[in-house]
Amino acid sequence: MKTERVNVNVNNQPYPIYIGENLLQDKSLLQRHVKGRQVMIVSNETIAAFYLDPLKAIYQDFQCDTFILPDGEQYKTLEYWERILHKLASCNHHRDTTLIALGGGVVGDITGFAAACYQRGVDFIQVPTTLLAQVDASIGGKTAVNHPVGKNLIGAFHQPKAVIIDLNTLNTLPEREFKAGMAEIVKAALIKDEKFFTDLENKMSDLLQRNFIFLQAVIKRAAEIKRDIVNADEKERSGERALLNLGHTFAHAIERLLGYGQWLHGEAVSAGLVLAAQLSHRKNLLDFESLQRICRLLTQISLPIHFPKSINADELLSAMYMDKKVANERLHLILLEDLGHAVVSDQVDDRELKSFLENG
């Protein structure tokens, strides 16, 4: 298989995304984006068991330190972020060090935030090992940790020097996590590319069988969609990047109310996508057949299309207001005018939203 490359250029900070097989064995590639002689690999207990030793071997001629997190969203906290910084300082890492995030979205987010803050900013490389991280979390420079009040409330924008996606890491990904990652691919299609959505409908059976040929193609297309949006609006100033939050205002509230880790992020995103589509239909933006197609595709993946019955409408609405997409005390929701055409809207008031959440 030929390695595919997607080039990102954010504010004249270009970096590549590589997508291929056996990239974790490519010494030249993995050393190419390290400018100094120090690296620190951050991973979690689950991923480290599979991939840490081979990656350390690539950097055997470097000062190579490691930090291993427990596995789970509940560890994406200021406490563990501070522990990473302490390890960097105690091991005497300099400004030319490079952090390597080996893992899923939690590892990538907390490592990127540590890199953004250590000595006012050092390099880092994303090596995402989950489908969700490969198509979304590793691209675009958003780094953060959670706070009890809300998800990703404390963070920074800090672009990686490279994103290295080894498709072989998907072989060790549990089925539930693999399917959760599909939600972000569906989201990308809904935002910008109706043809891509149709391709997903036609190829989903092969994708769920982890066919690498099809997976490489859809990961590349999802990465291109995110690349184009991030290039145009790195820090959500113009509203373009906000489109990437389709379904996420609902999803982040669901995750927080259930307790981080009870639902995977992609599972909450799936329910959020359906809520956004249903609300779009209610406001006469999205036709019923398109809504049905979205529900059918997510159901085929075995992802949730309803928010949990244990959460009531008042709780969900209150939690949504802790989202970063609140401006001037109004929720800015991402809605759909069509498959492949998302828009930012502040035209949903609390009364309408509460009625929608209570009655659908």
UniProtKB/Swiss-Prot annotation:
NAD(+) binds at residues 71-76, 105-109, 129-130, 142, 151, 169-172. Its cofactor is Co(2+); Zn(2+); NAD(+). Keywords: Amino-acid biosynthesis, Aromatic amino acid biosynthesis, Cobalt, Cytoplasm, Lyase, Metal-binding, NAD, Nucleotide-binding, Zinc. Binds 1 divalent metal cation per subunit. Can use either Co(2+) or Zn(2+). Pathway: Metabolic intermediate biosynthesis; chorismate biosynthesis; chorismate from D-erythrose 4-phosphate and phosphoenolpyruvate: step 2/7. GO terms for biological process: amino acid biosynthetic process; aromatic amino acid family biosynthetic process; chorismate biosynthetic process. It is found in: Cytoplasm. Zn(2+) binds at E184, H248, H265. Its EC number is 4.2.3.4. One of its GO terms (cellular component) is cytoplasm. One of its GO terms (molecular function) is metal ion binding. Transmembrane segments: none annotated. Catalyzes the conversion of 3-deoxy-D-arabino-heptulosonate 7-phosphate (DAHP) to dehydroquinate (DHQ). PANTHER family: 3-DEHYDROQUINATE SYNTHASE, 3-DEHYDROQUINATE SYNTHASE, CHLOROPLASTIC. This is 3-dehydroquinate synthase. The gene is aroB.
